[in-house]
Regions:
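Alpha/beta-hydrolase-fold enzymes
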Residues: 1-64
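Active-site nucleophile elbow and catalytic-triad environment of alpha/beta-hydrolase enzymes
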Residues: 64-82
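Catalytic active-site module of serine/aspartate enzymes centered on a nucleophile-bearing elbow/loop
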Residues: 125-161
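Catalytic histidine neighborhood in serine/cysteine hydrolases
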Residues: 106, 110-132
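Conserved alpha/beta-hydrolase "acid-adjacent" motif
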Residues: 99-105
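Hydrophobic, well-ordered secondary-structure elements that form the walls
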Residues: 86, 109, 148
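Generic beta-strand/beta-sheet core signal
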Residues: 2-3, 93-95, 124
Length: 161
């Protein structure tokens, strides 16, 4: 996985304080507050360039314009229905300084890939390896692609889940 995106909606909710993140599930699952979501997300991007960019990208990805529709669409993209159904060897790269994917999702990814033929998880920590700890290991793509190439060619030992 390049990157370990368990749930696409996480990209928008990561900047929220951790206690508020679960509330997005309620909002995404309930169509009634759509007008409130749309109003709030017309204002909020003015205070956060990161949120503004992420909403713009989400609109582009989904082809939708209303924030409430975008949130519902992103909420549908999750690995949850695939849990236990993936059986091929898997490589997962994860960094604890990822701007879009909460690092704590790694355990969800491991659970989803529990039946993989093999699971090789490479974890990068900002304190030791700041370039590789970023989203999609963007700080050192050559190294990231080398890791993937070596893994695909069997030059790296594959570890179990």
């Amino acid at each position: 996985a390049f990157d370990m995106m368990y749930r696409l909606l996480d990209g928008l909710t990561l900047p929220l304080p951790r206690p508020l993140r679960p509330m997005t599930d309620v909002i995404v699952g309930n169509p009634r507050p759509a007008w409130l979501i749309d109003a709030a997300l017309r204002i909020a991007p003015r205070f956060s360039a990161d949120l503004a960019w992420k909403l713009q990208q989400a609109r582009h990805l989904t082809g939708l314009s209303k924030p409430s529709e975008v949130l519902r669409a992103l909420g549908a993209f999750t690995m949850e229905p695939l849990e236990g159904l993936i059986h091929q060897p898997c490589l997962v790269l994860a960094g604890d300084a990822d701007q879009y994917v909460p690092f704590e999702r790694l355990e969800d990814v491991r659970r989803a890939l529990a039946n993989a033929a093999s699971l090789d998880v490479r974890v990068f920590h900002e304190a030791e390896d700041p370039d590789m700890a970023q989203h999609c290991q963007i700080g050192d793509l050559n190294r990231a692609f080398t890791i993937m190439g070596d893994w695909l060619s069997g030059q790296q030992p594959r570890s179990g889940a």
